[in-house]
Amino acid sequence: MLYGMIGRPTHCLLLRDENVRSTRLIPNFMVVLCALILTGAVGGENPRASAPPMRVVGYLASWGVNTKGTSIANLPAKHLTHVFYAFAEIAPDGSVTLGNRCVDVGACGKSASLPRVAGGNFHELRRLKARYPHLRLTISVGGWAGSARFSDAALTDASRRKFAGSAIDLFIRRWPALFDGIDIDWEFPVEGGLKGNVERPEDKQNFTLLLAELRRELDAQGKRDNRHYELTIAASARPAEIANLEVDRITPLLDFINVMTYDYHTGGSIAHFNAPLYAAPHDPTPEMTIDSTMRVFRNANVPAEKLLVGIPFFSRAYGGVANVNGGFLQAAPTPPKNWHDSDGDWRRLSVTRLRDPHYKRYWEATARVPWLYDASTGNWISYDDPESVRAKMDYVRGQGFGGVVIWELGGDDGQLMRAIAGEN
Protein backbone atom coordinates (compact mmCIF):
# COMPACT_ATOMS: atom_id res chain seq x y z
CA MET A 1 0.00 0.00 0.00
CA LEU A 2 1.17 3.52 -0.75
CA TYR A 3 0.37 6.34 1.62
CA GLY A 4 1.03 10.09 1.37
CA MET A 5 -0.71 13.41 1.43
CA ILE A 6 -1.82 13.00 -2.16
CA GLY A 7 -3.29 9.54 -1.59
CA ARG A 8 -2.58 6.69 -4.01
CA PRO A 9 -1.70 8.21 -7.40
CA THR A 10 -2.55 6.00 -10.35
CA HIS A 11 0.77 6.70 -12.03
CA CYS A 12 2.73 5.51 -9.01
CA LEU A 13 0.78 2.28 -8.93
CA LEU A 14 1.40 1.85 -12.66
CA LEU A 15 5.11 2.37 -12.16
CA ARG A 16 5.19 -0.19 -9.40
CA ASP A 17 3.12 -2.78 -11.27
CA GLU A 18 4.79 -2.49 -14.64
CA ASN A 19 8.30 -1.89 -13.25
CA VAL A 20 10.93 -0.34 -15.53
CA ARG A 21 8.99 -1.08 -18.71
CA SER A 22 6.56 1.73 -17.83
CA THR A 23 9.03 4.50 -17.01
CA ARG A 24 9.41 5.62 -20.58
CA LEU A 25 5.65 6.28 -20.68
CA ILE A 26 5.66 8.54 -17.61
CA PRO A 27 6.91 12.14 -17.63
CA ASN A 28 10.15 12.73 -15.76
CA PHE A 29 8.56 14.91 -13.12
CA MET A 30 6.06 12.13 -12.34
CA VAL A 31 8.86 9.57 -11.97
CA VAL A 32 10.60 11.89 -9.50
CA LEU A 33 7.36 12.55 -7.62
CA CYS A 34 6.62 8.83 -7.37
CA ALA A 35 10.12 8.19 -6.09
CA LEU A 36 9.69 10.86 -3.43
CA ILE A 37 6.40 9.38 -2.32
CA LEU A 38 7.79 5.86 -2.19
CA THR A 39 10.76 6.96 -0.07
CA GLY A 40 8.63 9.05 2.28
CA ALA A 41 10.15 12.38 1.21
CA VAL A 42 6.73 13.88 0.50
CA GLY A 43 4.70 14.88 3.56
CA GLY A 44 2.35 12.56 5.42
CA GLU A 45 2.99 9.29 7.18
CA ASN A 46 6.00 7.18 6.32
CA PRO A 47 5.01 4.46 3.87
CA ARG A 48 4.19 1.17 5.51
CA ALA A 49 6.08 -1.88 4.38
CA SER A 50 3.87 -4.10 2.30
CA ALA A 51 2.77 -7.30 4.02
CA PRO A 52 4.48 -10.49 2.86
CA PRO A 53 2.37 -12.68 0.59
CA MET A 54 0.23 -15.24 2.36
CA ARG A 55 1.98 -18.56 2.84
CA VAL A 56 0.17 -21.75 1.98
CA VAL A 57 2.17 -24.62 3.45
CA GLY A 58 1.23 -28.21 2.75
CA TYR A 59 2.71 -31.15 4.60
CA LEU A 60 3.28 -34.16 2.35
CA ALA A 61 3.35 -37.51 4.16
CA SER A 62 5.95 -39.74 2.53
CA TRP A 63 3.93 -42.86 3.28
CA GLY A 64 0.90 -41.50 1.45
CA VAL A 65 2.60 -40.85 -1.87
CA ASN A 66 1.28 -43.18 -4.57
CA THR A 67 -0.83 -45.06 -2.00
CA LYS A 68 -3.75 -42.69 -1.33
CA GLY A 69 -4.24 -41.40 -4.84
CA THR A 70 -1.51 -38.84 -4.24
CA SER A 71 1.33 -38.32 -6.70
CA ILE A 72 3.96 -35.64 -6.36
CA ALA A 73 3.57 -34.64 -9.99
CA ASN A 74 -0.09 -33.81 -9.38
CA LEU A 75 0.28 -31.81 -6.17
CA PRO A 76 -1.59 -28.47 -6.32
CA ALA A 77 1.70 -26.57 -6.48
CA LYS A 78 0.22 -23.48 -8.11
CA HIS A 79 -1.77 -22.90 -4.91
CA LEU A 80 1.13 -23.65 -2.54
CA THR A 81 4.10 -21.60 -1.43
CA HIS A 82 5.77 -24.48 0.46
CA VAL A 83 5.76 -28.26 0.54
CA PHE A 84 6.94 -29.72 3.86
CA TYR A 85 8.12 -33.30 3.37
CA ALA A 86 7.30 -35.51 6.36
CA PHE A 87 9.37 -36.90 7.94
CA ALA A 88 13.07 -37.19 8.57
CA GLU A 89 13.97 -39.11 11.73
CA ILE A 90 16.45 -38.95 14.58
CA ALA A 91 18.82 -41.91 14.69
CA PRO A 92 19.83 -43.57 17.99
CA ASP A 93 23.11 -41.61 17.94
CA GLY A 94 21.21 -38.30 17.73
CA SER A 95 21.92 -37.54 14.08
CA VAL A 96 19.18 -36.70 11.60
CA THR A 97 18.50 -39.36 9.00
CA LEU A 98 16.00 -40.24 6.30
CA GLY A 99 12.62 -41.53 7.38
CA ASN A 100 12.50 -44.17 4.64
CA ARG A 101 15.59 -44.50 2.45
CA CYS A 102 13.84 -46.50 -0.23
CA VAL A 103 10.80 -44.25 -0.57
CA ASP A 104 12.67 -40.98 -0.07
CA VAL A 105 15.68 -41.41 -2.36
CA GLY A 106 15.40 -44.86 -3.93
CA ALA A 107 18.11 -46.42 -1.74
CA CYS A 108 16.37 -49.77 -1.29
CA GLY A 109 17.95 -52.71 0.47
CA LYS A 110 20.04 -52.80 3.65
CA SER A 111 23.34 -52.43 1.80
CA ALA A 112 22.23 -49.61 -0.51
CA SER A 113 24.25 -46.42 -0.12
CA LEU A 114 22.78 -42.95 -0.41
CA PRO A 115 22.94 -41.73 -4.01
CA ARG A 116 24.58 -38.47 -4.99
CA VAL A 117 21.61 -37.86 -7.27
CA ALA A 118 18.48 -38.62 -5.31
CA GLY A 119 15.84 -40.91 -6.72
CA GLY A 120 12.48 -41.75 -5.18
CA ASN A 121 10.27 -38.99 -3.84
CA PHE A 122 13.16 -36.52 -3.70
CA HIS A 123 13.66 -36.87 -7.44
CA GLU A 124 9.99 -36.20 -8.05
CA LEU A 125 10.08 -33.20 -5.73
CA ARG A 126 13.03 -31.74 -7.62
CA ARG A 127 11.07 -32.10 -10.85
CA LEU A 128 8.08 -30.40 -9.22
CA LYS A 129 10.25 -27.46 -8.16
CA ALA A 130 11.57 -27.14 -11.69
CA ARG A 131 8.00 -26.82 -12.97
CA TYR A 132 7.03 -24.35 -10.21
CA PRO A 133 10.08 -22.18 -9.46
CA HIS A 134 8.21 -20.24 -6.77
CA LEU A 135 7.75 -23.38 -4.67
CA ARG A 136 9.89 -23.87 -1.56
CA LEU A 137 10.64 -27.33 -0.20
CA THR A 138 11.31 -27.98 3.48
CA ILE A 139 12.30 -31.18 5.24
CA SER A 140 10.34 -31.77 8.44
CA VAL A 141 12.01 -33.70 11.25
CA GLY A 142 10.06 -35.68 13.83
CA GLY A 143 6.29 -35.81 13.90
CA TRP A 144 3.95 -37.52 16.34
CA ALA A 145 5.56 -40.94 15.92
CA GLY A 146 9.10 -39.61 15.48
CA SER A 147 9.69 -37.41 18.52
CA ALA A 148 11.03 -39.97 20.99
CA ARG A 149 14.68 -38.87 20.68
CA PHE A 150 14.29 -35.09 20.54
CA SER A 151 14.92 -34.62 24.25
CA ASP A 152 18.25 -36.45 24.03
CA ALA A 153 19.22 -34.62 20.84
CA ALA A 154 18.59 -31.25 22.50
CA LEU A 155 20.25 -32.13 25.81
CA THR A 156 23.86 -30.90 25.46
CA ASP A 157 25.94 -28.57 23.33
CA ALA A 158 27.53 -31.59 21.65
CA SER A 159 24.21 -33.31 20.92
CA ARG A 160 22.73 -30.10 19.53
CA ARG A 161 25.72 -29.58 17.24
CA LYS A 162 25.46 -33.17 16.03
CA PHE A 163 21.75 -32.82 15.31
CA ALA A 164 22.07 -29.53 13.45
CA GLY A 165 25.23 -30.45 11.58
CA SER A 166 23.88 -33.79 10.40
CA ALA A 167 20.59 -32.24 9.25
CA ILE A 168 22.39 -29.66 7.15
CA ASP A 169 24.92 -32.16 5.81
CA LEU A 170 22.16 -34.50 4.66
CA PHE A 171 19.44 -32.19 3.43
CA ILE A 172 21.23 -29.00 2.40
CA ARG A 173 24.73 -30.04 1.29
CA ARG A 174 24.25 -33.56 -0.09
CA TRP A 175 21.49 -32.60 -2.54
CA PRO A 176 22.08 -28.90 -3.30
CA ALA A 177 19.14 -26.70 -4.31
CA LEU A 178 16.60 -29.35 -3.28
CA PHE A 179 15.58 -28.23 0.21
CA ASP A 180 15.05 -24.62 1.19
CA GLY A 181 14.71 -25.09 4.91
CA ILE A 182 14.29 -27.30 7.96
CA ASP A 183 11.14 -27.74 10.03
CA ILE A 184 11.20 -29.15 13.57
CA ASP A 185 8.06 -31.04 14.56
CA TRP A 186 8.81 -32.01 18.17
CA GLU A 187 5.61 -33.39 19.67
CA PHE A 188 6.13 -32.28 22.43
CA PRO A 189 8.80 -30.77 24.68
CA VAL A 190 8.43 -31.55 28.42
CA GLU A 191 5.20 -33.59 28.17
CA GLY A 192 2.19 -34.47 26.05
CA GLY A 193 3.71 -36.65 23.35
CA LEU A 194 3.48 -40.32 22.50
CA LYS A 195 3.84 -42.73 25.38
CA GLY A 196 7.47 -43.83 25.60
CA ASN A 197 8.97 -40.53 24.41
CA VAL A 198 11.90 -39.27 26.46
CA GLU A 199 10.69 -36.16 28.31
CA ARG A 200 12.50 -33.76 30.64
CA PRO A 201 11.50 -30.53 32.40
CA GLU A 202 14.53 -28.83 30.82
CA ASP A 203 13.22 -29.60 27.32
CA LYS A 204 11.68 -26.13 27.36
CA GLN A 205 15.05 -24.39 27.52
CA ASN A 206 16.89 -27.01 25.48
CA PHE A 207 14.47 -26.67 22.58
CA THR A 208 15.39 -23.00 22.36
CA LEU A 209 19.08 -23.90 22.34
CA LEU A 210 18.53 -26.52 19.64
CA LEU A 211 16.75 -24.00 17.43
CA ALA A 212 19.49 -21.44 18.06
CA GLU A 213 22.12 -23.94 16.89
CA LEU A 214 20.09 -24.76 13.80
CA ARG A 215 19.61 -21.07 13.04
CA ARG A 216 23.35 -20.42 13.43
CA GLU A 217 24.34 -23.28 11.12
CA LEU A 218 21.66 -22.51 8.54
CA ASP A 219 22.78 -18.89 8.43
CA ALA A 220 26.41 -19.95 8.02
CA GLN A 221 25.47 -22.25 5.16
CA GLY A 222 23.27 -19.56 3.67
CA LYS A 223 26.18 -17.15 3.69
CA ARG A 224 28.28 -19.67 1.76
CA ASP A 225 25.45 -20.30 -0.69
CA ASN A 226 24.41 -16.64 -0.96
CA ARG A 227 20.83 -17.36 0.07
CA HIS A 228 18.53 -17.72 3.09
CA TYR A 229 17.48 -21.07 4.51
CA GLU A 230 14.23 -21.12 6.45
CA LEU A 231 13.77 -22.53 9.95
CA THR A 232 10.27 -23.32 11.20
CA ILE A 233 8.52 -25.37 13.85
CA ALA A 234 5.18 -27.11 14.19
CA ALA A 235 3.65 -25.95 17.47
CA SER A 236 0.85 -27.44 19.53
CA ALA A 237 -2.49 -25.65 19.74
CA ARG A 238 -3.06 -26.64 23.36
CA PRO A 239 -2.36 -23.92 25.95
CA ALA A 240 -0.61 -26.32 28.34
CA GLU A 241 1.84 -27.40 25.64
CA ILE A 242 2.39 -23.86 24.33
CA ALA A 243 3.45 -23.02 27.90
CA ASN A 244 6.32 -25.49 27.48
CA LEU A 245 7.88 -23.28 24.78
CA GLU A 246 10.01 -20.20 25.36
CA VAL A 247 7.90 -18.38 22.82
CA ASP A 248 9.60 -15.01 23.30
CA ARG A 249 13.04 -16.52 22.69
CA ILE A 250 12.30 -18.86 19.81
CA THR A 251 10.24 -16.43 17.72
CA PRO A 252 13.26 -14.36 16.54
CA LEU A 253 14.99 -17.58 15.46
CA LEU A 254 12.12 -18.74 13.24
CA ASP A 255 10.84 -17.68 9.85
CA PHE A 256 7.34 -18.72 10.88
CA ILE A 257 5.40 -21.04 13.18
CA ASN A 258 3.00 -23.70 11.92
CA VAL A 259 0.32 -23.86 14.60
CA MET A 260 -1.42 -27.25 14.61
CA THR A 261 -4.91 -25.88 15.22
CA TYR A 262 -6.64 -29.25 15.08
CA ASP A 263 -6.85 -32.43 17.15
CA TYR A 264 -8.30 -30.34 19.97
CA HIS A 265 -10.32 -33.21 21.40
CA THR A 266 -8.44 -36.33 20.33
CA GLY A 267 -8.89 -39.00 22.97
CA GLY A 268 -11.80 -37.20 24.60
CA SER A 269 -14.91 -38.90 25.90
CA ILE A 270 -17.49 -36.59 24.34
CA ALA A 271 -18.26 -35.93 20.69
CA HIS A 272 -16.49 -32.67 19.93
CA PHE A 273 -15.00 -30.74 17.04
CA ASN A 274 -11.58 -31.40 15.57
CA ALA A 275 -10.83 -27.79 14.57
CA PRO A 276 -13.48 -25.29 15.74
CA LEU A 277 -12.84 -21.69 14.82
CA TYR A 278 -14.71 -20.35 17.86
CA ALA A 279 -16.38 -21.93 20.88
CA ALA A 280 -19.91 -23.18 20.32
CA PRO A 281 -22.60 -22.22 22.84
CA HIS A 282 -22.35 -24.33 26.01
CA ASP A 283 -18.91 -25.61 25.01
CA PRO A 284 -17.26 -26.78 28.27
CA THR A 285 -13.78 -26.13 26.81
CA PRO A 286 -13.94 -22.66 25.21
CA GLU A 287 -10.14 -22.39 25.28
CA MET A 288 -9.86 -25.27 22.79
CA THR A 289 -10.53 -23.30 19.61
CA ILE A 290 -8.46 -21.83 16.83
CA ASP A 291 -9.16 -18.27 17.88
CA SER A 292 -8.22 -18.96 21.51
CA THR A 293 -4.97 -20.64 20.45
CA MET A 294 -3.95 -17.82 18.16
CA ARG A 295 -4.67 -15.30 20.91
CA VAL A 296 -2.22 -17.13 23.17
CA PHE A 297 0.54 -16.64 20.61
CA ARG A 298 -0.44 -13.03 19.89
CA ASN A 299 -0.54 -12.25 23.61
CA ALA A 300 3.03 -13.58 23.75
CA ASN A 301 3.92 -10.89 21.19
CA VAL A 302 4.47 -13.23 18.27
CA PRO A 303 3.96 -11.12 15.12
CA ALA A 304 0.80 -12.15 13.30
CA GLU A 305 2.68 -12.54 10.03
CA LYS A 306 4.86 -15.26 11.64
CA LEU A 307 1.85 -17.38 12.59
CA LEU A 308 0.20 -19.92 10.27
CA VAL A 309 -3.20 -21.40 11.11
CA GLY A 310 -3.56 -25.15 10.67
CA ILE A 311 -6.27 -26.58 8.43
CA PRO A 312 -6.93 -30.33 8.68
CA PHE A 313 -7.72 -32.34 5.59
CA PHE A 314 -8.78 -35.21 7.87
CA SER A 315 -11.63 -35.98 10.24
CA ARG A 316 -12.06 -37.33 13.76
CA ALA A 317 -14.83 -39.73 14.69
CA TYR A 318 -16.61 -41.07 17.75
CA GLY A 319 -18.91 -44.06 18.21
CA GLY A 320 -21.89 -44.92 20.37
CA VAL A 321 -23.04 -41.31 20.53
CA ALA A 322 -26.59 -40.67 21.74
CA ASN A 323 -29.09 -39.07 19.38
CA VAL A 324 -29.40 -35.80 21.28
CA ASN A 325 -28.58 -32.48 19.58
CA GLY A 326 -27.24 -34.40 16.62
CA GLY A 327 -24.78 -36.06 18.98
CA PHE A 328 -22.76 -32.90 19.63
CA LEU A 329 -21.28 -32.82 23.15
CA GLN A 330 -22.82 -36.20 23.96
CA ALA A 331 -20.91 -39.03 25.61
CA ALA A 332 -18.83 -41.03 23.14
CA PRO A 333 -17.89 -44.39 24.68
CA THR A 334 -16.21 -45.98 21.63
CA PRO A 335 -14.85 -45.02 18.22
CA PRO A 336 -16.44 -46.60 15.14
CA LYS A 337 -14.96 -50.06 14.74
CA ASN A 338 -14.19 -49.57 11.03
CA TRP A 339 -12.49 -46.21 11.40
CA HIS A 340 -8.93 -45.74 10.18
CA ASP A 341 -6.83 -42.92 8.73
CA SER A 342 -7.21 -43.75 5.04
CA ASP A 343 -10.99 -43.71 5.42
CA GLY A 344 -11.09 -40.53 7.46
CA ASP A 345 -9.55 -37.91 5.21
CA TRP A 346 -11.63 -35.56 3.09
CA ARG A 347 -10.74 -37.39 -0.14
CA ARG A 348 -12.49 -40.54 1.11
CA LEU A 349 -15.12 -38.89 3.27
CA SER A 350 -16.49 -36.89 0.36
CA VAL A 351 -17.33 -40.06 -1.58
CA THR A 352 -18.36 -42.30 1.33
CA ARG A 353 -20.07 -40.84 4.41
CA LEU A 354 -21.16 -37.64 2.69
CA ARG A 355 -23.04 -39.75 0.14
CA ASP A 356 -24.41 -42.18 2.69
CA PRO A 357 -28.11 -41.42 3.36
CA HIS A 358 -27.73 -42.61 6.96
CA TYR A 359 -25.44 -39.67 7.72
CA LYS A 360 -26.91 -36.22 8.22
CA ARG A 361 -24.76 -33.10 7.90
CA TYR A 362 -25.02 -30.48 10.64
CA TRP A 363 -23.47 -27.01 10.83
CA GLU A 364 -22.48 -25.17 14.02
CA ALA A 365 -22.84 -21.49 13.15
CA THR A 366 -20.66 -20.10 15.95
CA ALA A 367 -17.82 -22.63 15.74
CA ARG A 368 -18.07 -22.45 11.92
CA VAL A 369 -17.60 -26.18 11.38
CA PRO A 370 -19.75 -29.08 10.14
CA TRP A 371 -20.26 -32.57 11.46
CA LEU A 372 -21.89 -35.81 10.32
CA TYR A 373 -24.06 -38.06 12.43
CA ASP A 374 -25.62 -41.45 11.82
CA ALA A 375 -28.42 -41.86 14.36
CA SER A 376 -28.80 -45.55 13.51
CA THR A 377 -25.25 -46.41 14.58
CA GLY A 378 -24.26 -43.49 16.81
CA ASN A 379 -21.25 -42.72 14.63
CA TRP A 380 -20.31 -39.04 14.83
CA ILE A 381 -17.70 -37.38 12.58
CA SER A 382 -16.04 -33.98 12.88
CA TYR A 383 -14.41 -32.76 9.68
CA ASP A 384 -13.68 -29.70 7.55
CA ASP A 385 -15.33 -29.03 4.20
CA PRO A 386 -15.12 -26.15 1.70
CA GLU A 387 -17.54 -24.03 3.75
CA SER A 388 -15.53 -24.30 6.97
CA VAL A 389 -12.25 -23.83 5.09
CA ARG A 390 -13.57 -20.60 3.58
CA ALA A 391 -14.51 -19.43 7.08
CA LYS A 392 -10.98 -20.18 8.29
CA MET A 393 -9.46 -18.31 5.35
CA ASP A 394 -11.64 -15.27 6.11
CA TYR A 395 -10.39 -15.42 9.69
CA VAL A 396 -6.73 -15.69 8.66
CA ARG A 397 -7.00 -12.71 6.33
CA GLY A 398 -9.02 -10.68 8.81
CA GLN A 399 -6.49 -11.22 11.60
CA GLY A 400 -3.47 -10.58 9.38
CA PHE A 401 -1.87 -13.96 9.99
CA GLY A 402 0.94 -15.17 7.77
CA GLY A 403 -1.03 -17.92 6.08
CA VAL A 404 -2.20 -21.47 6.59
CA VAL A 405 -0.61 -24.88 7.04
CA ILE A 406 -2.28 -28.08 5.86
CA TRP A 407 -2.09 -31.58 7.26
CA GLU A 408 -1.88 -33.21 4.84
CA LEU A 409 -1.92 -32.84 1.08
CA GLY A 410 -2.88 -36.44 0.35
CA GLY A 411 -6.21 -35.97 2.11
CA ASP A 412 -7.77 -33.68 -0.50
CA ASP A 413 -9.54 -34.30 -3.79
CA GLY A 414 -9.02 -30.68 -4.85
CA GLN A 415 -12.09 -29.12 -3.24
CA LEU A 416 -10.42 -27.95 -0.03
CA MET A 417 -7.42 -26.50 -1.82
CA ARG A 418 -9.70 -24.59 -4.15
CA ALA A 419 -11.47 -23.19 -1.09
CA ILE A 420 -8.12 -22.05 0.30
CA ALA A 421 -7.29 -20.41 -3.02
CA GLY A 422 -10.70 -18.73 -3.16
CA GLU A 423 -11.78 -20.63 -6.25
CA ASN A 424 -15.00 -22.08 -4.82
Where are these regions (language model features)?
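Substrate-binding surface in catalytic domains of secreted glycosidases
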Residues: 57-58, 93-117, 189-349
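Conserved, mostly hydrophobic/aromatic
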Residues: 83, 139, 184, 214, ...
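Glycan-recognition patch characteristic of GH18 chitinases/ENGases
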Residues: 48-172, 202, 331, 338-341, ...
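Bacterial Sec-dependent signal peptides at the C-terminal "C-region" and cleavage site
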Residues: 37-51
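Extracellular low-complexity, Gly/Ser/Thr-rich intrinsically disordered linkers
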Residues: 357-424
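Bacterial N-terminal signal peptides
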Residues: 28-40
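An active-site-proximal structural segment forming one wall of the substrate-binding cleft
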Residues: 156-182, 213, 242-253
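Generic structural signal for well-ordered alpha-helices
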Residues: 122-126, 164-168, 204-215, 290-295, ...
